[in-house]
Every structure is written in C-alpha cells, then in structure tokens.
C-alpha cells in the first residue's frame, strides 16, 4: 500500500500544480452557451443560446424554425447548426427574459453516457488506491438525466446516496478508433455534471458492479449550458467545486485528471462508435461523503451545488 501511495504522489508531483480557482469565471459575452429550455409560452423543449451565465436566452427555434428542438438532433446537423447559432448570436434577435424560461439539461436523450471512475490523482490518494493505468469505464442510463435545478430523489432502495461534482464533455462528430491528436475535432463542448451515487449499491450489492448504484432516476443532473470548446481557456485547468448546504466539500482542479479528454475519446472509441450527443463524465475529485470519517450521505432537505470555472453551476435540492 505504501508503494501505491508513492506512485500516486509521483503522478501528483508531475501534474500541473495550479491551485484551484476560487471564483467562477464569467464566460466571454459572445460565448456559445447552448441550452435546452421551456418557456412560459411553450411547454415543449426548445434550443437556445444563453447570452451569459445566468443571462437571457436567444430562442434558436424562433430564429430558424427549421432547426430541431432537441440538442442531440441539433448536434447531428454538424457545423451548419453551430453556424446558425453563431448567426443568431450576432443578430441579437428573439431574446427571451430569463424570468420567462426554465432550463432543462443541455442534452436529455444521448445515445450513451460514458463515465470514468477514479480519474483524479487526488481522489485516488483519498482512497489510498493506485492511479489507474487505463480508464475505468462505467455508464449511466439517459433516464438518470435531470436539469440544473431539478430535484435529486433519494430512492427507497438506498441509504447511502453521495455527491460527485464532475466535468462533462459532449461529442459533436461521429467517430470510431479516433486518434488522440484528432480527438478534439469530435468534441462540441463542456458542461457541469453531478454523478450522484448510491454507495451501498455501488460497493456492497449487485456483485459490486457499479451500474445500478449510478443510474437511479435523477442521478445525473447536467447544466446549466453546453459551452462550446472554442471559448474555454483550458478544460484541463478549471477549478471544480461541490457544496452541500453551502459547505465546501470538494475543491480541486481539472488538472488533476489522470486521463484527459483526448485520451478518453481515443480509449472509448476503440470499443464503441461515438455519436453526436454522447456524454462523457470525466470523474470526480476528492471530498466525497463515503470516504469521510464517519461517512456522510445526502438526505432530504439538502441542496447540492456543483460548479466549474467558465462553465457555471448547477444546484439541485434533495428530496
């Protein structure tokens, strides 16, 4: 075990040593913050652009009625859809007041949600386990996705529901056997994710296979926006934090990731074809409840806020 710790410390030493940033940076005014939303005039999902984090929304479906109303289908259109969105942003038309809309998850029906376990050096140190030599892959079902302010429901089957703030990225271009040097061509952007986890089902039941503990309904809040990659300074050097009832429980930086975006795409695409709309959850930093002494788990009445610099924050009540 001492050897494992030394290996992890060597990896930590070689990682970027930028300290976690303290405040959420505001994205540039003309950033592409793609959202799905409902308005007071229409209960059906629509595609929009958030003018800034927490700002008003450009209704892309009003700007161009030929655009699909769901993000996956929008991304399947490829570069033409993004160019239309940029034109809408430049036009400054069809703006809806934030008070008249409610945000949904930026994507609600991906073909795949690919999740990475133990992908932060400091999270491996927290568990006193070796840093993985290959990505550890598991998944969630799309039925677990909820929006940036929707409730997280504690299932009757679990007494050990835990928090995990994560950086997520979304595929924008189909590919198989993708090389690392080409991987970013397949990424459309990034968002904030919360990999809610039932530790009893993940670690003690179901043969310790992770799926059931990870994929209860409401166990994948996403949002607030899908921020296109071109306006993010460096996705692998962003402060990432989680707060439970206002208390800071996770505080790290994405530079602690063992496998970055490019490596994850190259690895996963060896096994499966990646399609537009597929979501990757890239792992969580230290500070989760299960490894506290004594362990701490979520309960009804809690509020969990996950935030990442340049992307924004999601805040979900627990019921």
Swiss-Prot record:
Binding-site list for Mg(2+): 164, 166, 195
Cell compartments where the protein resides: Mitochondrion
Keywords tagged on the record: Isomerase, Magnesium, Metal-binding, Mitochondrion, Transit peptide
A Gene Ontology term for the protein's cellular component: mitochondrion
Assigned EC number: 5.3.2.2
The organelle targeting sequence, given as a residue range: 1-31
Details of cofactor binding: Requires a divalent metal cation for activity.
InterPro entries tied to this protein: FAH, Fumarylacetoacetase-like_C, Fumarylacetoacetase_C_sf
GO biological process: oxaloacetate metabolic process
Function of the protein: Tautomerase that converts enol-oxaloacetate, a strong inhibitor of succinate dehydrogenase, to the physiological keto form of oxaloacetate. It is thereby required to maximize aerobic respiration efficiency by preventing succinate dehydrogenase inhibition.
UniProt family annotation: Belongs to the FAH family.
Protein's name in the database: Oxaloacetate tautomerase fahd2, mitochondrial
Organism annotation: Xenopus laevis
Record gene name: fahd2
